[in-house]
Each structure stands twice: as structure tokens, then as C-alpha cells.
A protein has these predicted regions:
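Bacterial Sec-dependent N-terminal signal peptides
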Residues: 1-22
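Short secondary-structure capping/junction motifs at helix and strand boundaries
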Residues: 3-4, 19, 153, 157-164
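Hydrophobic side chains within alpha-helical segments
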Residues: 6, 87, 144-146
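Low-complexity, Ser/Thr/Pro/Gly-enriched N-terminal "stalk/linker" regions
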Residues: 20-133, 160-183
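Aromatic-rich carbohydrate-recognition surfaces in CAZymes
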Residues: 75-82, 135-157, 197-200
Length: 204
């Protein structure tokens, strides 16, 4: 149960894709997983989700560069695991056409995601922890995954809000390009020490 939320992307999206081949059972499992995450990880105060279940505010997160504001009492998840909900909703809606996933995306997941949006630095993008906690690190790969999901979502909904946001995110992502280290996009804007596969080949 503890890492269920973080694993959502790796379980939910493949399940949705498999539903096209394997029938309704995979779609049902994907929906069950989504509903369980929403139920167990809910943080009503912010309309967001916890990093782990059960909540552990003193946990040590090992997948960030740790150059921004220190999150000493972590109330909600970082952007990377939360963005799995975006991927999940988009995949479920694309696969099933069920408007409950569109409603969930537009009315709950996207408004929650907007709390991570950073307007204090240019180009604007999503930062790793909600803006209400101050400035935090910004990752090119995290924003890339969201931009791809927004493009996919626009393709099936024709909602230009998501297309505009995807374009804005790609403006940010391309700002991370440098010819140093053999060329490519950095991983973390605030700690330009590596150019990982996740920030350079995520489209594939």
C-alpha cells in the first residue's frame, strides 16, 4: 500500500492500453486502482494527494535535487507522483470514452495540478512542490510528461486550455537546452549537472 501512489503511472497507463486488447477486465482494474488512490491518499485541505499511505511527514524523498525550499512538514505529494493522476485520467478517458474521467480531470486533477504552477520565474512551469509552500525545484522531465499528457488530452477533447498549457510547458522545456555535456536538456533547472534520458527521450 505504501508506494501505491508513486507506482500509479507504471500500473494504470499500461492497464488502460491493455484494455484495448484484453477486454473490460483491465479497464476495471485500472479504474479500481484510480479510485483507491483517490480515496486513500486524499488531502481535503488542498484538494491534493499524499506522497505515501499512510502519511509520513518526516519521510526522506530521494528523487529530488533538494535545492529549493526545504519541505519539513510534507502535507501533499510532489509533482512527479501527482502527475501520474494526469496520465491515468487521460489514458482512461482515451480508452473508455467515459465522461466521468473527463470530469475528474477537469474539475479535480487539473485544478490540483495548477497549485504547482510557478509564476515567479520565467518561463513559467510546474514546480516540484505546490507554490503555497514557496519556491521549489523545477524539473524539465516532470513538465515534459505533463505536456505530453495535455497534448494527448487535447487530441480527444479539443479543449484549447490544455493545448495552450502544453505549448507553454514546451517553451519552458526547450529553455533547458544547452550544448554543454554533448547537448540536450538538463534534468533540474536549479542543479544543472546531468542530462538524463527522462528529460531528453520522454516523447519516445
Amino acid at each position: 500500500m505504501r508506494k501505491l501512489f508513486i507506482a500509479l503511472t507504471f500500473l494504470l497507463v499500461p492497464a488502460c492500453l491493455s484494455a484495448q486488447l484484453g477486454g473490460k477486465i483491465y479497464l476495471q482494474r485500472a479504474d479500481s486502482l484510480l479510485q483507491r488512490v483517490l480515496s486513500l491518499y486524499e488531502v481535503k485541505k488542498y484538494g491534493l494527494l499524499m506522497e505515501t499511505y499512510p502519511r509520513n511527514p518526516k519521510q526522506q524523498i530521494t528523487y529530488t535535487a533538494n535545492t529549493g525550499s526545504e519541505v519539513t512538514q510534507q502535507e501533499v505529494s510532489f509533482l512527479w507522483p501527482y502527475s501520474a493522476m494526469v496520465s491515468g485520467c487521460v489514458s482512461l478517458y482515451k480508452t473508455s470514452g467515459n465522461k466521468k474521467y473527463k470530469k475528474l480531470m477537469d474539475k479535480q486533477i487539473k485544478p490540483g495540478l495548477d497549485l504547482y504552477w510557478d509564476t515567479t520565474r520565467q518561463p513559467e512551469c510546474y514546480q516540484s512542490y505546490p507554490a503555497f509552500a514557496g519556491q521549489n525545484d523545477r524539473y524539465y522531465d516532470d513538465n515534459d510528461w505533463v505536456a505530453i499528457d495535455f497534448c494527448d488530452y487535447y487530441a480527444v477533447t479539443k479543449n484549447k486550455e490544455y493545448l495552450k498549457k502544453a505549448i507553454a510547458l514546451h517553451d519552458y522545456i526547450y529553455s533547458g537546452w544547452s550544448d554543454e555535456l554533448g547537448g540536450g536538456i538538463y534534468w533540474c533547472e536549479q542543479k544543472k549537472e546531468s542530462k538524463n534520458t527522462c528529460s531528453n527521450r520522454s516523447e519516445e
